[in-house]
């Protein structure tokens, strides 16, 4: 089923896309697809960070494209006032054909009038946000940390053990590697996935890395990358 967006170069188009992405990680489905690529390609520059959801989505798709590209087909998407092709976009001849009325059933305006169910769901989300005091619904984030030792004599195996020994709900440690810094010193780069509502990265660093016993090995820790997933 094709979906339509207004011009993402305009303030109105960005605002509506930002509202659409409030409860979604991708344009369609549960993984990056050609639909995301089509909308991504409609941007001449990165969107303003004031459009929180669009900026989060754009950064994530940009990172995926740099890593491995997008492989899923998607459902088809049209972005008005752009020249982005879509596999599900009807030909000009088809648009003028008598059967155009039937095509309209498959051309869904995502920003059209809401149904009663959609209005009710939006009200419930707004109530939940107000009750929790948060600006948006919880999600997950992928975080890359640089963990630095005191000197070249620090046992890096013990340092990594101290890091991975930090366990809490909503925290999952991932891949790691040692990266040379200079003068025989190496730092630990380690990935982690967190549930945003359950884990504060700043608090984790302050409360666990900079206190005993971890601070025997850890001199400092920096957040290198922080991306929504």
From Swiss-Prot:
- Protein's recorded name: Elongation factor 1-delta 1
Describe the family membership recorded for this protein in Swiss-Prot or TrEMBL.
Belongs to the EF-1-beta/EF-1-delta family.
Positions with biased composition (Acidic residues): 100-109
Q: Name one GO biological process term.
A: translational elongation
CDD domains, sorted = EF1B
Under the subunit heading, UniProt states: EF-1 is composed of 4 subunits: alpha, beta (1B-alpha=beta'), delta (1B-beta), and gamma (1B-gamma).
> Where does the record place a coiled coil?
none
* GO MF assignments: guanyl-nucleotide exchange factor activity; translation elongation factor activity
Q: In UniProt terms, what function does this protein have? A: EF-1-beta and EF-1-beta' stimulate the exchange of GDP bound to EF-1-alpha to GTP.
One Gene Ontology term, aspect cellular component: eukaryotic translation elongation factor 1 complex
